[in-house]
A protein has these predicted regions:
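One-carbon transfer enzymes
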Residues: 1-148
Length: 148
């Protein structure tokens, strides 16, 4: 499926599933069944470019977390690097937050910032932010599981 996370999970002998997206309702119902069947108590989203329904979030009673490539609440949604460059921001960064029923608006678990240089463009900024995303996601999970 060309999904790096699934490749790593398979090589590490971690149970994993690929759920084909046909439509939102079917997808979410199939995912919820798998989560319940396997007694999953934390969902970590990364590069998941879909918005979960209020119903899904409510039905999955454990935390759902997401990593976002901006210093939320600034630049929710897409094109975060372009917006930061266009607005001549001095800093950008990454945020791990709890998913709620509003886009990129849940409680912030952890953030880290990077300096935006005059020489930066979308591509170089994306690379810098991705580097800290990899660093802070595991920290956020530990923080969440140890109740901060």
């Amino acid at each position: 499926f060309n999904v790096k996370g699934l490749e790593i999970a398979s090589k590490s002998r971690i149970k994993n599933y690929y759920v084909k997206y046909s439509n939102k309702r079917n997808f979410e119902n199939r995912v919820l069944k798998l989560l319940n069947k396997n007694k999953i108590d934390l969902i970590c989203l990364a590069g998941f470019m879909k918005i979960l329904s209020k119903k899904f979030i409510k039905k999955f009673s454990s935390p759902i977390i997401n990593i976002h490539p901006s210093l939320l609440p600034k630049y929710k949604g897409l094109n975060t690097h372009m917006k930061a460059i266009k607005n001549k921001d001095k800093y950008s960064g990454a945020t791990v937050h709890i998913v709620n029923d509003k886009l990129d608006s849940g409680k912030i678990i952890i953030q880290e910032k990077v300096r935006i240089l005059k020489s930066d463009n979308e591509k170089t900024l994306k690379k810098k932010v991705l580097k800290i995303e990899h660093k802070i996601y595991s920290k956020a999970i530990i923080k969440l599981l140890t109740n901060y």
